[in-house]
Amino acid sequence: MVGRLSLQDVPELVDAKKKGDGVLDSPDSGLPPSPSPSHWGLAAGGGGGERAAAPGTLEPDAAAATPAAPSPASLPLAPGCALRLCPLSFGEGVEFDPLPPKEVRYTSLVKYDSERHFIDDVQLPLGLAVASCSQTVTCVPNGTWRNYKAEVRFEPRHRPTRFLSTTIVYPKYPKAVYTTTLDYNCRKTLRRFLSSVELEAAELPGSDDLSDEC
């Protein structure tokens, strides 16, 4: 699944075109091209300002003190089983300047089931209104990923300082929940685009039966 927020009169993201080559761009991965975590990790470190840690992540000191869990790829496999990386979660963030004085939040919830549908929820303070909101969800039959595209226009048109997107794909379960949050952070002044894809190893019986089950 690909998440993207399109806002009018927003300058092009810094180094967005330079981050197209990632380690997950292989056609066999089943995922569309996405920036490599190593690229945005370096960009965040050299941006010249501090960045708050993402929800659920550890600070560098805490991460160093916490023992790392053994990788599933390093565990012994039973005969006839093969490991395959399946999408576990997807997240991205965007920060812009100037900063608005009040918070604006845009939440989108997409549910996939037998009757494909999605729910939109826009929360705005007094004095702000949505000029237009459009959303398109494309489900690819017999595929391992979906296309997601959303466009929101606010009046008055404030530029977002931060955009967070998270997607969780449940293995072997034909339902995915996609939640998007757009909010303002008055303490941030940098313009960034961050994208990451988290994968976990799954055991499949037989290396020849690598179907699109994840």
UniProtKB/Swiss-Prot annotation:
One of its GO terms (cellular component) is cytoplasm. InterPro entries: Refilin. It is found in: Cytoplasm, Cytoskeleton. Keywords: Cytoplasm, Cytoskeleton, Phosphoprotein. Residues 1-56 are annotated as: Disordered. One of its GO terms (biological process) is epithelial to mesenchymal transition. The keyword Iron does not apply. One of its GO terms (molecular function) is filamin binding. Its main location: cytoplasm. Coiled coil: none annotated. It comes from the Eukaryota. Pfam families: FAM101 (PF15068). Interacts with FLNA and FLNB. Belongs to the Refilin family. Involved in the regulation of the perinuclear actin network and nuclear shape through interaction with filamins. Plays an essential role in the formation of cartilaginous skeletal elements. This is Refilin-B. It comes from Homo sapiens (Human).
